[in-house]
Amino acid sequence: MKRLILTVLAAGAVGTAAAQECGEPMTLQRCLELGLEQNYDVRIIRNEQRISDNDATAANAGMLPSVGLTAGYSGALDNERTTPREGDAVTENGIYDQTFDAGVAVNWTLFDGFRIRTNYKRLQELQQMGALRTRITIEDFVATLTAEYYNYVQQTLRLSNFRYAVQLSRERLRITEERFKIGSFSRLDLLQARVDFNADSSKYMSQHELVTASRIRINELLANDDLNGRLSICDSLIEVNSTLEWDRLEAETRAANASLLLAGHDNTLAELDLKSIRSRFYPYLNLTAGYGYTYNRFGNGATQSRGTLGLNAGVKLGFTIFDGNRRREQRNARITIENTELTRQQLEQSLMANLSNFWQAYRNNLEVIQLETENLIAARENYEIAMERYLLGDLPGIEMREAQKSLLDAEERILTAQYNTKLCEISLQQISGNIGVYLQ
């Protein structure tokens, strides 16, 4: 327990130093909030959702009339030669006739076999699917950033453990050098202690790369301009939620998983496509109306000009007798409906399989944590006894190294088990649609 406290304090000291250099430490919740505001994938999918929202209108479905405004001018320049049955021919040159017109026209499809209504429902389905795709992207981002956040905690703790290993090896090297000077230890003992110290130092230096890589990855997910910027977080331990329940996870997965809900909307779209095809078996009814003004100016004749202002309207009823494709398209649409339902069932089975696998790994890792906690206590006590014997000269350097290695391995195993359990926990929460718990 004393060693564990030292590890935590060391990690806390690292976090405090970083905080002094790069500002206030951030919690996981704060990281997620920043990421949801700045991450490029999230911003892109939200813009795509806005497009779906804009498209889901009655006008886009064709439920509203179309109104057009027209205006025009035309002119004709003619030369005329008129020869009567009796008398002389009359020639007129440069006759210029002009026409001005302006009007408003309305076209409205009153009925087309329910196709317009089906199109509107389809646009609404696409709008809901856009919202689900946004949710899926956000859930993927929350899961990815949460996993990387705790990976950074893991790598930082591992760096602290390696630092502690270097301190132990340095102390052992110091003792060995002193004993070698007075003849208590051989040169072989001294060389072995130096080799072990260098090996631990090399591991410590290599671990810095993993910490840096994790920090860069978090900055990338947060869309920070400075990917190499310093990062300070509040957590110095990996806290695992051990209270998850299988029955609740299973029920919530079937009811709230975003991908499963999206597959259900795919099936609904296929059914709407079939309805749209069936609408072609019905007649259609179109309404047209117009209001316009026409002005004619004549270059010759008894009439100099004429203006016409009027309203016109009409109704057109039609029916497509044969187009050669309707029955074939209906058969294909029914097959598509069946396939979308099969795809949804396949996805549900795949999700339940993944949920079961992560659940088994989650429960197993919880037991591993408990077991490795006991091993850590035993390894720590074993190391303390070995150090006492080593200081008395009653324990060879190789056995001392073994005791040190056993302690470090125990710390590594429990850290790995905690992180693996956290990953399983994150996956279970995401599959069941509860990944938002990390935002609370």
Enumerate the predicted regions with their spans.
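Small/polar, glycine/serine/threonine/aspartate-rich low-complexity segments that form flexible
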Residues: 20-24, 70-108, 234-243, 275, ...
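Bacterial Sec-pathway N-terminal export signals of envelope proteins
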Residues: 19-72, 78, 225-268, 348, ...
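Heptad-repeat amphipathic alpha-helical coiled-coil interaction surface used
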Residues: 44, 49-51, 56-58, 120-122, ...
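Bacterial Sec-dependent N-terminal signal peptides
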Residues: 1-29, 439-440
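Acidic, low-complexity, intrinsically disordered peripheral segments
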Residues: 6-7, 20-21, 413-440
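Sec/SRP-type N-terminal targeting helices
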Residues: 43-47, 60-61, 96, 110-138, ...
